Amino acid sequence: MIRQVIQRISNPEASIESLQERRFWLQCERAYTWQPIYQTCGRLMAVELLTVVTHPLNPSQRLPPDRYFTEITVSHRMEVVKEQIDLLAQKADFFIEHGLLASVNIDGPTLIALRQQPKILRQIERLPWLRFELVEHIRLPKDSTFASMCEFGPLWLDDFGTGMANFSALSEVRYDYIKIARELFVMLRQSPEGRTLFSQLLHLMNRYCRGVIVEGVETPEEWRDVQNSPAFAAQGWFLSRPAPIETLNTAVLAL
């Protein structure tokens, strides 16, 4: 700790640059869009709430949301999650009327920190159609059990096939739905052997969850492949591009 302080004193330019970068991310502004998730039969099953991040100095340029959430603190991330929950709560009638789910992205540390927020937990209990989508797999603390994580409702796992979300995740937590990353989907489609492996992989994953959702479907051919696979649902630009949250009531309920 003392060494870090000495290093900062001896290198004031780096310290100033760090403060400026932190201030930059704190000045960023958020807006929200939604993207539908369709079952392979064409029925709308859920919508994902997506965060659009911009900076006042260049509001037309979108910044990477994952970088934004990495740069802000856990307490700030909890404020964002609360903001997202409040926004979706205003659309409760839409989700209830059509029997739809809504997913909100969240990282592991923020999810665990939410356990200390009784007001937010009570709000979550009043929204049975809300789902938290983990953007990374988290190992449960030693004093935690899966039962203790169920207070958030059924959990989804995002980006299966990336570094953080892999097979080790399947045995530790019983996820409701698991999303396969587009990168893995595209890689396996490149050869007949890969297509066979993709089908086998989905069969295996279905043993550990209610269904697999394929992300990043961008062409008619990709959508057809997903429909002919053991996948439960899909999401991507071919099905629908993200739209402003204000237009949620215009969602196409069946393709």
UniProtKB/Swiss-Prot annotation:
Effect of a null allele: Disruption leads to increased expression of adhesive curli fimbriae genes, including CsgD. Also leads to a severe reduction in swarm size and swimming velocity, and 80% reduced concentrations of c-di-GMP. Disruption of ycgR, or concomitant disruption of dosC, dgcE, dgcQ and dgcN completely restores motility, suggesting these 4 genes, together with this c-di-GMP phosphodiesterase, form a network that regulates cell motility by altering levels of c-di-GMP.
Listed EC numbers: 3.1.4.52
Residues annotated as domain EAL: 13-255
Catalytic activity: 3',3'-c-di-GMP + H2O = 5'-phosphoguanylyl(3'->5')guanosine + H(+)
Superkingdom to which the source organism belongs: Bacteria
GO molecular function, one term: nucleotide binding
CDD domains: EAL
The protein's name: Cyclic di-GMP phosphodiesterase PdeH
Annotated organism of origin: Escherichia coli (strain K12)
